[in-house]
């Protein structure tokens, strides 16, 4: 405690970020302050050099303060910089007592550029700062379904570069395009089609009606498979904005955030209103071992959503709850980010309060549907058995694959909300000369991405204690809090044998080794994760090997033998680099010893 007491007596009166650590140097909490000295001292009571938690703080904060042994500060120019740095460090390091919101993606917009002669609808996540561009969104889902429907219902130019070809393509032959590339339609006539496209984007009821008519025509012509495609697409588009029946007389442009939580679970709902209509909505389920702080959740939600410049900014942002201090901070952040004043408020009456109540009702409904399942019980049992600090709600699983240390690859699969999240899977080409070097490279590359893709609760490594120690060392150097276990396959490595629960695999934790019965549900849960990562890595290895074989065959056709191929690969590093190299460069390599 002497170190902590010394730090508390020498705090700066500057803006910055502070970090609390326990006696083992595990990161507990990250916060920011306009005045570090005032903010940090508010956590503690000091009497006769004895440090105790401030009794006015919440029980969650008091519990954390009892564990603080060290603190560090990072000074910045102003409070805005501190706010952004705090959010970035929380995502990267995942402290024990901070809430982590993972949904920081930029939602797509549909846009049409009317400065061109023949505008078409396209999807973007970037801003095109030019006149004549009209945006619609954001769409939390279904943007591609809308786009596909527009291109099928209307004779639009089907591809961005079609006009340059100056020749009608098959879309003209099947009556899906009017061939402006061959001047078969005037700009004025095409503009009428483009405006009809705009109307369908703005009025999804009309779009759905047109899709239903087409589905009925296909069905009456016994083209049932195509009709089913339209049925499924209609269902997806209908789900885009479940609140579209709420049309307000005032044409508000609003973003609405509602946070509801209890115990160790919470839900954040986001709704987007444009022109008085809710056009899309999204929600995120959040878990925390140490309870929730609404201010912290709202700050992360707002910063994550608005940190990237968005093409359509609302007139106002509505929140269901937030302290005056946090509201002021966020107001300054938004105004600074977009160089204009955008009001943040907590409505107390009228239409806007009704919108918040609807968002809260949806958050509560989603929360109540989160019933405890058998999988949740297994997660609790896994946490207890392996002595994990956190329930492993989000898990990343790693495996490598190679053939005689060639075509070395690695795979990461992700498991969350009781299912594999295939959109989050990642593949890696590796250079390591053995399985330990390959695993080290794989895990290091993942850890370096923590700032972009926040770390999970748990890493599961396909390997033994050596691989486990590699993972622990990498995480220690990254400063991030992620727990790790490893599972080593038994020598009798039959997939059929394992799938029946017969494997006697060994699970390693930092402090223990477990040999569980084949029927143990906790073992089977870990095996399920390991087997998916193994499948993913093996499939990537096979596709890489097949691609390389094709490349070798092509080089052989050009008169380059296997020994020469190896020399070229050793020098250039990949087949892609060989293809880009000039004949002179390749000849120079083949004449020198590598």
From Swiss-Prot:
Domain annotation UVR: ranges: 205-240
Places the protein is found: Cytoplasm
Domain GIY-YIG: 13-99
One GO term of the biological process aspect: nucleotide-excision repair
UniProt entry keywords in alphabetical sequence: Cytoplasm, DNA damage, DNA excision, DNA repair, Excision nuclease, SOS response
One Pfam family this sequence matches: GIY-YIG
Main localisation: cytoplasm
GO molecular function terms attached to this record: DNA binding; excinuclease ABC activity
Gene Ontology annotations for the cellular component aspect, listed alphabetically: cytoplasm; excinuclease repair complex
Record InterPro entries: GIY-YIG_endonuc (IPR000305), GIY-YIG_endonuc_sf (IPR035901), GIY-YIG_UvrC_Cho (IPR047296), RuvA_2-like (IPR010994), UVR_dom (IPR001943), UVR_dom_sf (IPR036876), UvrABC_protein_C (IPR050066), UvrC (IPR004791)
Subunit structure: Interacts with UvrB in an incision complex.
Protein family membership: Belongs to the UvrC family.
Function description: The UvrABC repair system catalyzes the recognition and processing of DNA lesions. UvrC both incises the 5' and 3' sides of the lesion. The N-terminal half is responsible for the 3' incision and the C-terminal half is responsible for the 5' incision.
Name under which the protein is recorded: UvrABC system protein C
Source organism of the structure: Helicobacter pylori (strain G27)
């Amino acid at each position: 405690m002497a170190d902590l007491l010394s730090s508390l007596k020498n705090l700066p009166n500057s803006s910055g970020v502070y970090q609390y650590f326990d006696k083992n140097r595990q990161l507990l909490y990250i916060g920011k302050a306009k005045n570090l000295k005032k903010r940090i001292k508010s956590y503690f009571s000091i009497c006769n050099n004895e440090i105790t938690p401030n009794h006015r703080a919440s029980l969650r904060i008091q519990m954390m303060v009892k564990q603080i042994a060290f603190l560090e500060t990072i000074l910045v120019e102003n409070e805005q910089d501190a706010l952004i740095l705090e959010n970035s460090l929380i995502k990267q390091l995942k402290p024990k007592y901070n809430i982590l919101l993972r949904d920081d993606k930029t939602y797509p917009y549909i846009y049409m550029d009317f400065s061109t002669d023949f505008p078409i609808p396209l999807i973007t996540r970037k801003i095109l700062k030019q006149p004549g561009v009209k945006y619609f969104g954001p769409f939390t889902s279904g943007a591609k379904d809308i786009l596909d429907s527009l291109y099928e219902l209307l004779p639009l130019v089907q591809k961005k570069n079609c006009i340059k070809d100056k020749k009608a393509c098959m879309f003209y032959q099947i009556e899906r395009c009017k061939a402006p590339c061959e001047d078969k339609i005037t700009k004025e006539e095409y503009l009428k089609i483009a405006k009809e496209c705009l109307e369908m984007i703005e009025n999804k009821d009309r779009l759905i009606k047109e899709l239903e008519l087409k589905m009925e025509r296909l069905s009456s012509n016994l083209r049932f498979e195509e009709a089913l495609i339209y049925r499924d697409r209609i269902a997806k588009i209908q789900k885009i904005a479940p609140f579209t029946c709420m049309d307000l007389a005032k044409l508000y442009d609003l973003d609405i955030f509602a946070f509801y939580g209890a115990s160790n679970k919470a839900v954040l709902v986001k709704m987007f209103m444009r022109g008085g209509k809710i056009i899309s909505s999204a929600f995120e389920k959040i878990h925390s071992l140490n309870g929730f702080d609404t201010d912290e959740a709202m700050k992360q939600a707002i910063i994550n959503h608005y940190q990237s410049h968005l093409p359509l900014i609302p007139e106002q942002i509505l929140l269901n709850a937030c302290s005056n201090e946090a509201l002021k901070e966020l107001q300054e952040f938004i105004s600074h980010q977009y160089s204009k004043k955008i009001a943040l408020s907590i409505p107390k009456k009228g239409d806007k309060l009704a919108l918040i109540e609807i968002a809260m009702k949806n958050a509560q409904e989603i929360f109540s549907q989160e019933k405890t399942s058998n999988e949740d019980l297994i997660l609790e049992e896994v946490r207890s058995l392996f002595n994990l600090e956190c329930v492993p709600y989000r898990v990343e699983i790693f495996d490598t694959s190679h053939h005689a240390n060639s075509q070395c690859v690695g795979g990461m699969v992700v498991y969350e909300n009781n299912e594999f999240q295939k959109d989050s899977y990642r593949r890696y080409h590796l250079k390591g000369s053995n399985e330990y070097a390959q695993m080290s490279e794989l895990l290091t590359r993942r850890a370096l991405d923590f700032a972009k893709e926040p770390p999970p609760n748990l890493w599961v490594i396909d390997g033994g204690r050596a691989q486990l120690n590699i993972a622990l060392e990498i995480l220690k150097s990254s400063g991030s809090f992620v727990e790790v276990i490893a599972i080593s396959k038994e020598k009798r490595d039959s997939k059929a044998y394992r799938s029946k629960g017969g494997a006697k695999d060994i699970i390693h934790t930092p402090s223990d080794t477990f040999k569980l019965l084949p029927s143990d549900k906790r073992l089977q849960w870990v095996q399920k994760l390991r087997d998916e990562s193994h499948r993913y890595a093996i499939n990537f290895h096979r596709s890489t090997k097949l691609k390389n074989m094709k490349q070798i065959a092509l080089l052989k056709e050009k008169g380059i033998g296997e020994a020469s191929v190896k020399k070229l690969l050793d020098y250039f590093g990949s087949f892609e680099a060989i293809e880009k190299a000039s004949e002179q460069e390749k000849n120079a390599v083949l004449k020198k010893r590598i």
